[in-house]
């Protein structure tokens, strides 16, 4: 491209990219145009967030761990972390039991899978060491100038890591982030303090709720270590094939069932989900449900939970999961996410995942007459 595109065109392209990146931090005209295209046209948003929310978002993005430290001190009790540690251990044990019981996987591959599971690096709440921002200069001269300095500081921090051992204690998300992640190159799972709140987690709720909500999230991230991408990395985070050829073939055949199912989902008139693009996340949702449900039943076996508001513990488990993904989404955003997001739409993370789970049929007495019923031979069975 560099040799074929005229130099002036390359200059214009770089100038446009700079303005595009800076637009939301410049004068009102730039901000309005940026919103009109990216938010109104692409996502269907009707109005811009108030200035104070946009400013808070900027500080959160540039000084994430400063904000995170304040958030943790105010909103993250030690008891929440302790409960999460117990949940993670139970989920890890459950996934291990499921791997051992797999009929389609050989013993040599199982041994490698269990080794990888046992060496998960678990991060909960917040990092042990906070970032030092003392060299980042913030002035009253210009909003965009502050952003430039923050970007330069972040870039310098990244470059300084070159040639040094990987710091496995570094976090890739801030504590206040409402999310979680699995990183295959470090074989780590991370659950920031921000996700440990309703509707994902409730210190006052029973195990039916917490295993159905945050428990499935934990299982989801663990399963990422064994999805179509994660399974290609070994326990040390190296891109290395540790599967027998037959086991890899079995995995691919089972994963294709998932692809075919989601490919058949019509998310809007004439628009279908992309089963291949969303495969890793769909496998993780499926595995998360299976692993967390098994851990939930084991944790409550000695002291069964009562029926509450006419709902059994098993029903409340699945309702808690559904509540996590309940949302109101604009038609424009449905199209946008279907084309660009590796996650299935919230509706289908529920209605596409639950018909694959045998325990869901038992909990709600789902029969062939019900619209979400899926014959056993058509259900996904991986982890």
Task: Please report, for each region that a protein language model flagged, where it lies by residue.
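Intrinsically disordered, low-complexity linker/terminal regions across diverse proteins
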Residues: 49, 53-56, 60-383
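Noncatalytic, helix-rich "gating/capping" subdomain that lines the substrate-entry/channel surface
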Residues: 1-86, 90
């Amino acid at each position: 491209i560099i040799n074929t595109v005229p130099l002036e065109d390359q200059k214009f392209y770089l100038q446009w990219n700079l303005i595009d990146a800076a637009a939301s931090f410049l004068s009102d005209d730039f901000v309005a145009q940026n919103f009109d295209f990216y938010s109104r046209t692409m996502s269907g948003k009707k109005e811009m967030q108030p200035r104070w929310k946009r400013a808070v978002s900027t500080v959160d993005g540039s000084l994430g761990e400063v904000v995170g430290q304040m958030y943790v001190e105010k909103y993250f009790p030690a008891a929440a972390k302790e409960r999460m540690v117990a949940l993670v251990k139970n989920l890890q044990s459950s996934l291990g039991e499921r791997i051992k019981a797999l009929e389609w996987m050989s013993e040599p591959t199982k041994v490698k899978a269990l080794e990888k599971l046992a060496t998960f690096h678990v991060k909960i709440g917040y990092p042990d060491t906070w970032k030092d921002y003392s060299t980042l200069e913030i002035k009253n001269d210009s909003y965009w100038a502050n952003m430039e300095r923050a970007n330069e500081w972040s870039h310098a921090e990244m470059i300084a890591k070159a040639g040094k051992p990987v710091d496995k204690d570094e976090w890739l998300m801030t504590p206040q982030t409402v999310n979680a992640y699995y990183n295959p190159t470090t074989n780590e799972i991370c659950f920031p303090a921000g996700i440990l709140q309703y509707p994902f987690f409730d210190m006052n709720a029973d195990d039916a709720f917490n295993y159905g909500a945050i428990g499935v999230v934990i299982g989801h991230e663990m399963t990422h270590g064994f999805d179509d991408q994660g399974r290609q990395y070994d326990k040390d985070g190296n891109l290395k094939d540790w599967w027998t050829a037959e086991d890899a073939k079995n995995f691919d055949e089972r994963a294709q069932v998932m692809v075919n199912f989601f490919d058949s989902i019509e998310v809007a008139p004439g628009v279908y989900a992309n089963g291949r693009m969303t495969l890793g996340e769909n496998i993780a949702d499926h595995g998360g449900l299976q692993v967390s449900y098994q851990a939930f039943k084991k944790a409550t076996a000695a002291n069964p939970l009562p029926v509450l508001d006419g709902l059994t513990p098993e029903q409340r488990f699945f309702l808690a999961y559904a509540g996590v993904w309940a949302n109101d989404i604009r038609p424009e955003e449905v199209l946008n996410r279907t084309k660009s997001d590796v996650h299935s739409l919230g509706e289908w993370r529920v209605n596409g995942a639950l018909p694959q789970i045998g325990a869901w049929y038992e909990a709600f007495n789902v029969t062939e007459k019900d619209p979400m019923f899926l014959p056993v031979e058509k259900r996904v069975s991986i982890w």
